[in-house]
């Protein structure tokens, strides 16, 4: 949310997403899709809507740059228990993968900053935002990760942090925690 707000300010837009508004906007997965949903919710004419929609790629690039800076500054910690879970899975010799609708740049920055510079290499597959045409709750991102792992769904477990993510993992046939 803060990175979006930073991007809006940098791009000269008067928008500020509160925690409450962002909570509602999180029902739309994918940053570009979330921006589109927000623009579509505005009480504006079709010409202004199209002009704003045309700015989505640049707004998203700007948001990603702000978010990556926040990650590298240590402002975006891992959720409790994630480090232990990753360490235990690695110690057990399990293959790890990531299936996320965020950008690969954000994933790699978060891994390197929170787990160490070599952490991106711990994952046998990373499926990120633009890899999947349909975002969660569609199963696409999980299907891509499974394909890259050459695994059937019953040979993997998904750990999720959102209802849309759980729906996506289950739709892909994965046991989900």
Language-model features: where?
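Alpha-helix N-cap/helix-start and coil->helix boundary motif
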Residues: 1, 32, 83, 103-105, ...
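Active-site neighborhood of HAD-like aspartate-dependent phosphohydrolases
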Residues: 1-21
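Hydrophobic alpha-helical core bundles mediating ligand binding, dimerization, or RNAP-core interactions
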Residues: 3, 8, 31, 60-67, ...
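A metal-dependent, Asp-based hydrolase signature
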Residues: 14, 24-71, 80
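A short, structured active-site edge motif that brings together acidic residues
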Residues: 19-27, 50-55, 119-133
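Short beta->alpha linker loops
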Residues: 30, 54, 77-81, 102, ...
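Short, acidic loop-to-helix structural element flanking the phosphoryl-transfer center
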Residues: 53, 68-98, 108
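Substrate-recognition "cap/lid" segment bordering the active-site pocket of phosphatases
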Residues: 73, 97, 103-157, 163-174
